[in-house]
């Protein structure tokens, strides 16, 4: 169980909450989180890179010059990989980079990654009422009041999509906004700080607590 201090819009401590998630054993934690991270990054690859071999490049059917008597090196095609405009040797072809991982393992890795970042977790009260209309400057100021340095990367987790928060956060280069149901290992590990609303923490407990 991880105890968390709750901060309000002004950055003052107003209460406490707890996050209780089942995590991997200490000896297996790094391995399972690493596997989940590799899977996520591999599955994000399009795998559409493609090159043409000498057999696929247009042209090159006629022998450029006779085999002997010219003094030049022998050549059978002007689409040889040695020639400019020729085919590519061992170039990439479309392939599937995806890595499979069991559902229960993925969930365990996600919970483990989140708990491992508990020292960087900031829990705040719901602030949607503080932003009746999109205001990037006000959100940036609030994030600073919560203890985040200007150039630190922030993962902002909310319970549900709210347009005013989304529009306020999208122009802050160091802030990434996601919903509690869209948690992923890469974002959790990549951020310097994880800021979650109390409602988002409850949603995380509800969705991933099993």
UniProtKB/Swiss-Prot annotation:
Domain of life (superkingdom): Bacteria
Keyword NAD included in the entry's annotation: no
Membrane-spanning parts: none
Keywords: Ribonucleoprotein, Ribosomal protein, RNA-binding, rRNA-binding
Segments for region (Disordered): 41-79
A GO CC term assigned to this protein in UniProt: ribonucleoprotein complex
A molecular function GO annotation: rRNA binding
Comp. bias (Basic residues): 60-71
InterPro entries assigned: Ribosomal_uL4, Ribosomal_uL4-like, Ribosomal_uL4_dom_sf
Composition-biased stretches (Polar residues): 43-52
Gene Ontology biological process: translation
Coiled coil start-end: none
NCBIfam families, sorted: rplD_bact (TIGR03953)
PANTHER family hit by this protein: 50S RIBOSOMAL PROTEIN L4, LARGE RIBOSOMAL SUBUNIT PROTEIN UL4C
Family: Belongs to the universal ribosomal protein uL4 family.
Quaternary state and interactors: Part of the 50S ribosomal subunit.
Reported function: One of the primary rRNA binding proteins, this protein initially binds near the 5'-end of the 23S rRNA. It is important during the early stages of 50S assembly. It makes multiple contacts with different domains of the 23S rRNA in the assembled 50S subunit and ribosome. Forms part of the polypeptide exit tunnel.
Family annotation (HAMAP family): Ribosomal_uL4_B
Protein name: Large ribosomal subunit protein uL4
Source organism (scientific name): Cyanothece sp. (strain PCC 7425 / ATCC 29141)
Lineage, opening ranks: Bacteria, Bacillati, Cyanobacteriota, Cyanophyceae, Gomontiellales
């Amino acid at each position: 169980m991880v105890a968390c201090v709750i901060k309000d819009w002004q950055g003052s401590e107003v209460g406490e909450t707890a996050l209780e998630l089942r995590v991997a054993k200490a000896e297996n934690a790094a391995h399972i989180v690493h596997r989940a991270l590799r899977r996520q990054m591999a599955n994000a690859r399009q795998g559409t890179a493609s090159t043409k071999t000498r057999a696929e490049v247009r042209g090159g059917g006629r022998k450029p010059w006779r085999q002997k008597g010219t003094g030049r090196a022998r050549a059978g095609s002007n689409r040889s990989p040695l020639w400019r405009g020729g085919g590519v040797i061992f170039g990439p072809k479309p392939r599937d980079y995806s890595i499979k991982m069991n559902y229960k393992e993925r969930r365990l890795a996600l919970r483990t990654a989140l708990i491992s970042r508990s020292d960087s977790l900031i829990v705040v009260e719901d602030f949607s009422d503080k932003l009746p209309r999109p205001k990037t400057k006000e959100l940036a100021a609030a994030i600073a009041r919560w203890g985040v340095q200007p150039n630190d990367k922030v993962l902002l987790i909310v319970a549900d999509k709210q347009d005013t928060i989304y529009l306020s956060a999208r122009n802050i280069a160091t802030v990434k906004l996601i919903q509690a149901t869209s948690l992923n290992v890469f974002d959790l590990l990549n951020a310097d700080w994880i800021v979650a609303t109390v409602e988002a923490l409850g949603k995380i407990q509800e969705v991933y607590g099993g």
